[in-house]
Amino acid sequence: MSLFDKKHLVTQADALPGRNTPMPIATLHAVNEHSMTNVPAGMEIAYFAMGCFWGVERLFWQLPGVYSTAAGYAGGYTPNPTYREVCSGQTGHAEAVRIVYDPAVIRYEQLLQIFWENHDPTQGMQQGNDHGTQYRSAIYPLTPEQSAAAHASRERFQSAMAAAGNHRPITTEITHATPFYYAEDEHQQYLHKNPYGYCGIGGIGVCLPPDA
């Protein structure tokens, strides 16, 4: 596909067929050795897409209260896609991060603050120099409460941008979580395994106002 084509989401009818076999990954998180698949009692899950998932995953695994993180693909159609397929723009997925967190230590609203303040949510089908539908900004809520918090935070951040003189519209999609597919093991905790690797995330200098 051309770069122009990759700026437009593929339709479900035109998406690649994928496969039934899940991607094999390591059982344990390379940084904290917690399970990357199990969710301990009392923990919750959040899904965010902010561009290249290498830097995004590191951003969240460093937070107190985050039990584990995983790089993967969300918001698309193709079952169990490969990285190459996602980068083709023919699966509909965004590069996303799965975050398992303890809400008694860090709230979903605090994760949303990290989300908004650490990337540019106005760039459509790109993030910085990374172009393609897989780099779009997205929040994939799992519950009505997460959805309400996500939409409210988007309104507050848009207002904060306007107050700072930035009138570009936010392009972040907020849609109910579709299946999350783990990325290949080489992408898991990539910047821990490759400390000098590429990290393309960065904020726009606007802070998310607290919920009134």
UniProtKB/Swiss-Prot annotation:
Pfam families: PMSR
SUPFAM superfamilies: Peptide methionine sulfoxide reductase
Entry keywords, A to Z: Oxidoreductase
Reactions this protein catalyses: L-methionyl-[protein] + [thioredoxin]-disulfide + H2O = L-methionyl-(S)-S-oxide-[protein] + [thioredoxin]-dithiol; [thioredoxin]-disulfide + L-methionine + H2O = L-methionine (S)-S-oxide + [thioredoxin]-dithiol
GO cellular component: cytoplasm
Recorded GO MF terms: L-methionine-(S)-S-oxide reductase activity; peptide-methionine (S)-S-oxide reductase activity
InterPro entries noted in UniProt: Met_Sox_Rdtase_MsrA_dom (IPR002569), Met_Sox_Rdtase_MsrA_sf (IPR036509), MsrA_MetSO_reductase (IPR050162)
EC number: 1.8.4.11
GO BP field: cellular response to oxidative stress; protein modification process
Active site: C52
Keyword Oxidoreductase: yes
UniProt keyword Protein transport, yes or no: no
Top EC class, one word: oxidoreductase
Function summary: Has an important function as a repair enzyme for proteins that have been inactivated by oxidation. Catalyzes the reversible oxidation-reduction of methionine sulfoxide in proteins to methionine.
Family designation: Belongs to the MsrA Met sulfoxide reductase family.
Alphabetical list of PANTHER family matching this protein: MITOCHONDRIAL PEPTIDE METHIONINE SULFOXIDE REDUCTASE
Protein name according to UniProt: Peptide methionine sulfoxide reductase MsrA
Gene: msrA
